[in-house]
Amino acid sequence: MNFIKDNSRALIQRMGMTVIKQITDDLFVWNVLNREEVNIICCEKVEQDAARGIIHMILKKGSESCNLFLKSLKEWNYPLFQDLNGQSLFHQTSEGDLDDLAQDLKDLYHTPSFLNFYPLGEDIDIIFNLKSTFTEPVLWRKDQHHHRVEQLTLNGLLQALQSPCIIEGESGKGKSTLLQRIAMLWGSGKCKALTKFKFVFFLRLSRAQGGLFETLCDQLLDIPGTIRKQTFMAMLLKLRQRVLFLLDGYNEFKPQNCPEIEALIKENHRFKNMVIVTTTTECLRHIRQFGALTAEVGDMTEDSAQALIREVLIKELAEGLLLQIQKSRCLRNLMKTPLFVVITCAIQMGESEFHSHTQTTLFHTFYDLLIQKNKHKHKGVAASDFIRSLDHCGDLALEGVFSHKFDFELQDVSSVNEDVLLTTGLLCKYTAQRFKPKYKFFHKSFQEYTAGRRLSSLLTSHEPEEVTKGNGYLQKMVSISDITSTYSSLLRYTCGSSVEATRAVMKHLAAVYQHGCLLGLSIAKRPLWRQESLQSVKNTTEQEILKAININSFVECGIHLYQESTSKSALSQEFEAFFQGKSLYINSGNIPDYLFDFFEHLPNCASALDFIKLDFYGGAMASWEKAAEDTGGIHMEEAPETYIPSRAVSLFFNWKQEFRTLEVTLRDFSKLNKQDIRYLGKIFSSATSLRLQIKRCAGVAGSLSLVLSTCKNIYSLMVEASPLTIEDERHITSVTNLKTLSIHDLQNQRLPGGLTDSLGNLKNLTKLIMDNIKMNEEDAIKLAEGLKNLKKMCLFHLTHLSDIGEGMDYIVKSLSSEPCDLEEIQLVSCCLSANAVKILAQNLHNLVKLSILDLSENYLEKDGNEALHELIDRMNVLEQLTALMLPWGCDVQGSLSSLLKHLEEVPQLVKLGLKNWRLTDTEIRILGAFFGKNPLKNFQQLNLAGNRVSSDGWLAFMGVFENLKQLVFFDFSTKEFLPDPALVRKLSQVLSKLTFLQEARLVGWQFDDDDLSVITGAFKLVTA
């Protein structure tokens, strides 16, 4: 009793909670303490209070109880017992014994059994070596708020080491390898930060059993017989911070199996040894409060991933894999997780040549590995409960994709066995500095894979309820833009998981194209025209561009699904139905391998496409030549011989079938040699019909005639900002099967026998576009003569011309003097005269099919008002008119009332342009009264730029303007207009109600920052 009493202060300070509980258990078994007394001691939160309580209880119970207390103390903390008796165990061990033990450890850390490890578990016979495959990790030090505050290297971490140090990271981040590396570095003696440690012990906590001493002996090496357990524990106390414990995997540790290791972490102040412990994110909450330093393992760097791949794979396989990763943004993101790098390499191992595996294959391997690797953790869990939890995890992922949710709450996992999802590694749990826990998949792409896997199982289930559920998810995908963006990865992994699921997906996508939202675009690609207007305004450039963007992205999505599918040939019929009538864009500078597979394995699908768009770029050659000139022309023999890559030739020319239509675009060619022309001829021959576009190609001059001679099947030609010789122009007008001709920015002099002289030869033309072409009055007259022969033309654009005298009079007369099929006429900024407008007005009865009439940006001088009046008065014959943009002149605003009266009879009008009409408050009120009657049911575009309306006038107009619910575009630009605050407020209210608005032009309106803050919305606002 006196011994305990005399040493009570030391006992209270040094026993520790773990030893107190162990002694309490012994005393309960020996009937010294009853259950109530045990509860009192164990419920104490402070270890000193617990120690004080048990000592006072024992002293009251007499000497026999005190002897039993000392017996238990001797068992559980022998070094403390010896110290209290005035005996030190440490002196019993010689320095030589310690040196021998340290050397044995160092030797162990350099043996093959320690350096070689199974990165995917012992069931898979793939071995990595720690020396050659370790890459420098990225570590982040965390503060008390659990925020990243500093990036650390491994050496930086060791130099700043505090105990306990907690290293957290999601599964597969390389935490175990990191601790093994530290042990190896200590053993080598080459790491300065580790030389201060006498011993470094690496322990796997999943295998910890018994006491600390027993675990060390079991996992590392047999400690010499001269060092007993009590002596060893005393040595640890004596060496203090010269001993480093590397404790791997607290998330797999069972504290009851080894209370001493638990105490080493949570009561580190008693042991005084240094500790680094790793854990997964979801288990961090169990030890975070005890950490003196917390570090997170960050993403693997791209250089580290490449180094690892090159180290573990033979050169050919490594280069193939690195090329595949370079082409895939998704794979590049996944390579930030070391385990995924390992899996990607492992799939290639044993192969004689590189095989480009699909992302589904990689994720499937990863998913199954997680389940297999952690199956031992689920003993006692019923198989049905386990499967139900996995299904719920898939449902969670699937719902998350559709609701754009990638962070989940407790209620989301409350209906299943949370432990199953966490221990398999499918979900990660985040609790640090959070009132409510957050659950996430380790990567967004992994959530999409899990969702796709689940959708596949639903679509192929034998249970009708599950099939209905799966089809319900497909029915939510009704917009092409959503399918090609939001749901593209989900569909990819669904198709990669099952042939039958792919069949269901492709049938749905074919139905979407037929009946769904074909023209729905993502916000970043919203069209100027809404879908409804496109149905009424036919053959417009806007419509064609919009459809091309949508259909191309849709087709690319289909090819990716084909690529991902587990069986290509079995689904040929479904894929062919999907590709029927669609288009595909190909960049010749980056033709992916899967296109060759697509053409080879599904030739019927490729030929089912409506047309292929192929782009060639000459800029690389031009820049190379400039560099050669800058260096005096050195190494000219190394210049590439052709612009046209042979890869493009092999893709098209080696193909055994024909495309319906091929659209080839040449851009920025500084020259075109004979081999290029031969290559183009081979490519052109792969299509039944050809469209050729030439943009900014100075080098085509003189060669275009040769190019066209290889085009036996061309029906559309567009030349933009590319000079032409007289031979080129003559050859263009000799291609009599042309249906579309578009010439832009052609500024060389018109020569006899050239373009304007001979356009009449192209009698099959249906569309003629001439923009910014240099010509004089004589050229215009010749052009007019040629137009008389173009009886099939339905679209004519003549824009941005100058100095053509009275040439427009002749052109307008040729266009309108006889009944024709013209549906669209654009005569924009082309010296249109009042006389030409009169001629047009008098001949409107010959243009009854006209849908779009654009005469904007033309100033009518003499007799302009009279001409405009006459045009307006005769407009009643244009029963299909949907878009009207008028010219301007002096006092044209006087014609507004007459115009609006006629427009009341044109309910299908969607676009009206009165640019530079200089409308005043009077006219804007007249216009407001017109719109107040709501005569135009689907009105969408209004251009009143160049007005003179005051704030009062605009305020009056706003009351009606806000009712134009279908509006997508307006232009109210003017000069130096300072709007009143009341107008700004009203404008902001109106704009918020125009939910379809995509662009508002208010150039010249003098807004300050406050004004802009209230009128800015989801639309594009142009003020300068």
UniProtKB/Swiss-Prot annotation:
Q: Which residues form the CARD domain?
A: 1-88
Which residue ranges contain the repeat LRR?
Answer: 578-598, 656-679, 735-758, 762-785, 787-812, 824-847, 848-870, 878-902, 911-933, 936-963, 965-985, 999-1021
At the top level, the lineage of the source is Eukaryota
> What mutagenesis or variant effect is reported for residue 443 to P?
In FCAS4; the mutation increases oligomerization of the NLRC4 protein; results in hyperactivation of caspase-1 with an increase in IL1B protein secretion
GO CC annotations, alphabetized: canonical inflammasome complex; cytoplasm; cytosol; intracellular membrane-bounded organelle; IPAF inflammasome complex; plasma membrane
Annotated spans, Winged-helix domain (WHD): 356-463
Q: Where is the NACHT domain?
A: 163-476
Task: Please list the residues that carry the modification Phosphoserine.
Answer: 533
GO molecular function annotation: ATP binding; caspase binding; endopeptidase activator activity; identical protein binding; magnesium ion binding; protein homodimerization activity
Residues of the region (Nucleotide-binding domain (NBD)) are 95-298
Protein's GO biological process: activation of innate immune response; apoptotic process; defense response to bacterium; detection of bacterium; icosanoid biosynthetic process; inflammatory response; innate immune response; pattern recognition receptor signaling pathway
Q: Which InterPro entries match?
A: CARD (IPR001315), DEATH-like_dom_sf (IPR011029), LRR_dom_sf (IPR032675), NACHT_NTPase (IPR007111), NLRC4 (IPR042220), Nlrc4-like_WHD (IPR053882), NLRC4_HD (IPR040535), P-loop_NTPase (IPR027417)
Tell me which UniProt keywords the record has, alphabetically.
Apoptosis, ATP-binding, Cytoplasm, Disease variant, Immunity, Inflammasome, Inflammatory response, Innate immunity, Leucine-rich repeat, Nucleotide-binding, Phosphoprotein, Repeat
Annotated tissue distribution: Isoform 2 is expressed ubiquitously, although highly expressed in lung and spleen. Isoform 1 is highly expressed in lung, followed by leukocytes especially monocytes, lymph node, colon, brain, prostate, placenta, spleen, bone marrow and fetal liver. Isoform 4 is only detected in brain.
Q: Where in the cell is it found?
A: Cytoplasm; Cytoplasm, Cytosol; Inflammasome
Q: What is its main location?
A: cytoplasm
Q: Which residues bind ATP?
A: 169-176
PTM notes: Phosphorylated at Ser-533 following infection of macrophages with S.typhimurium (Salmonella). Phosphorylation is essential for NLRC4 inflammasome function to promote caspase-1 activation and pyroptosis. PRKCD phosphorylates Ser-533 in vitro.
> Subunit structure of this entry?
Homooligomer; homooligomerizes to induce formation of the NLRC4 inflammasome. Homooligomerizes following activation by pathogenic proteins. Component of the NLRC4 inflammasome, at least composed of NLRC4 and caspase-1 (CASP1). Some NLRC4 inflammasomes contain PYCARD/ASC, while some others directly contact and activate CASP1. Interacts (via CARD domain) with PYCARD/ASC, pro-caspase-1 (CASP1), NOD2, BCL10 and NALP1 (NAC) by CARD-CARD interaction. Interacts with EIF2AK2/PKR.
Q: Which disease is it linked to?
A: Autoinflammation with infantile enterocolitis: An autosomal dominant disorder characterized by neonatal-onset enterocolitis, periodic fever, and fatal or near-fatal episodes of autoinflammation. Affected individuals tend to have poor overall growth and gastrointestinal symptoms in infancy, recurrent febrile episodes with splenomegaly, and sometimes hematologic disturbances, arthralgias, or myalgias.
Give the PANTHER family listed for this entry: NLR FAMILY CARD DOMAIN-CONTAINING PROTEIN 4
Function (record text): Key component of inflammasomes that indirectly senses specific proteins from pathogenic bacteria and fungi and responds by assembling an inflammasome complex that promotes caspase-1 activation, cytokine production and macrophage pyroptosis. The NLRC4 inflammasome is activated as part of the innate immune response to a range of intracellular bacteria.
Entry's free-text remark on domains: In an autoinhibited form the C-terminal leucine-rich repeat (LRR) domain is positioned to sterically occlude one side of the NBD domain and consequently sequester NLRC4 in a monomeric state. An ADP-mediated interaction between the NBD and the WHD also contributes to the autoinhibition.
Identify this protein by name: NLR family CARD domain-containing protein 4
Gene name of the record: NLRC4
